[in-house]
């Protein structure tokens, strides 16, 4: 009988940035909450010298080895060394590539340029994050037309965390507060090729969040946390979204991930021309 390990080392080797590998490794490791994992990440492993350095570290802290490496020679060397160390060594892309090849009836094209595609994706996400931070909470309205998605809504409807989540997926996201009596920047209506989505939540949830966070936007304490006042803010926001034909998502019982998934679906429809923007 195998004795349960309370902690383990997870080594992740990639010939690119390792983002895909890290996501998979963490997703699987999270299923073993009773075991503490120590991550070791080795990106840009593209020659034998780099691999040997990584293997020397693995030798010091034996554990599970996951990898995404295209070069056959480097892969073979990695597997042989792991066999000698008697540690699991798993190519996480191999079964997926095999399934594609079998279904499509086409040999896998293992191209070095794919590494550059991954790197380009990484820098695209960095660019999206920079954009999103610059355009948080109504800042820099002149750049709204450059956004892929603009989130609108009253205070504390998860606009900022959802924006950051989308940016981490390479989506340039801005967010603009809808405040009764103040309005919104004209640039919002000039973003003709951008998906604009309204976020709402129950007055109870918003009141609870506001009571536990900094007060702002110039509201008096009472009106900022009062449920009746919040309900009026929500009515205002819903009317604005209805007026301009912007889809609305209720985030009351949604996680950030679930909200983002709904936005991804809307964005797909929008880009395919299935969502008619500003029907009025």
From Swiss-Prot:
Q: Is Kinase among the key words of this record?
A: yes
Q: Where is ADP annotated to bind?
A: 153-160
- Enzyme Commission (EC) number: 2.7.11.32, 2.7.4.27
Name the InterPro entries for this protein: Kinase-pyrophosphorylase (IPR005177), PPDK_reg (IPR026565)
- Enzyme class, UniProt record, top EC level: transferase
Q: Is Zinc-finger among this UniProt entry's keywords?
A: no
Q: Name one GO molecular function term.
A: protein serine/threonine kinase activity
Catalytic reaction equation(s): N(tele)-phospho-L-histidyl/L-threonyl-[pyruvate, phosphate dikinase] + ADP = N(tele)-phospho-L-histidyl/O-phospho-L-threonyl-[pyruvate, phosphate dikinase] + AMP + H(+); N(tele)-phospho-L-histidyl/O-phospho-L-threonyl-[pyruvate, phosphate dikinase] + phosphate + H(+) = N(tele)-phospho-L-histidyl/L-threonyl-[pyruvate, phosphate dikinase] + diphosphate
Q: Which family does it belong to?
A: Belongs to the pyruvate, phosphate/water dikinase regulatory protein family. PDRP subfamily.
**Function summary:** Bifunctional serine/threonine kinase and phosphorylase involved in the regulation of the pyruvate, phosphate dikinase (PPDK) by catalyzing its phosphorylation/dephosphorylation.
Q: What is this protein called?
A: Putative pyruvate, phosphate dikinase regulatory protein
Natural source organism? Bartonella quintana (strain Toulouse) (Rochalimaea quintana)
